[in-house]
Amino acid sequence: MNMRKYMIALAASLALFTGRANAQRCLPGMQGIEVKAAMTDGFRMSGNDGGHSFGALLSTYTKNGNKWSLGGEYLLKNSPYNDVKIPVAQFTAEGGYHFKVLSDARKIVFLYAGVSALAGYETVNWGDKVLYDGARLHDSDAFVYGGAVTLDMEVYVADRLALLASLRERCLWEGDTRKLHTQFGIGIKFIIN
């Protein structure tokens, strides 16, 4: 009888003091693949000056939920000229570090602020210097470098799947076109280990 009371007391105390387990997310060493798309310099889908970008990143989590990222991006921005668009494309590689600014207790929503170094190539009108009306472009293709500051939000919809939203400002030097680009983007992240 004494053993029975002891077992009941043990079971009651375990039921009383056991906390709820949360998902194991953003642990050091975990990696994820991010695929993103963004509108560049505004939300203009029509017209001659709308821009967009696509990118993929590998992110690796460190202590406190912070993360390193390494990846690449393609950005296309059209510059208006009479009735046509002159494409300006940038192909960049990037590496950066993102600090966890905020997260909820259940580890579903995360907010990050990060900085990245960028390097790549910029091409104007795909290298063609003469326009349809005989005008010549003075802007030339060039290797570019610079950086970006990013504000990212991750919302986990499953343990290995997150939806992403980002606001980003890129600054690249050595190109002949616009130096700063603001990006508003969405994406998806797959945790791979």
Could you tell me what each predicted segment is?
Residues 57-132, 190-193:
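Gram-negative (and chloroplast) outer-membrane scaffold detector with strong preference
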Residues 126-167, 190:
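Extended low-complexity acidic/polar segments
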Residues 1-30, 193:
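Cleavable N-terminal export/targeting peptides
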Residues 77, 152-193:
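Predominantly the C-terminal beta-signal and adjacent terminal strand-loop region
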Residues 41-44, 79-86, 133-139, 171-175:
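Extracellular loop and loop/strand-boundary signature of outer-membrane beta-barrel proteins
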Residues 29-31, 48-54, 85-93, 109, ...:
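Residues that define the transmembrane beta-barrel architecture of outer-membrane proteins
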Residues 22-71, 77, 189-193:
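Short glycine/proline- and aromatic-enriched beta-strand/turn motifs that initiate or cap beta-hairpins
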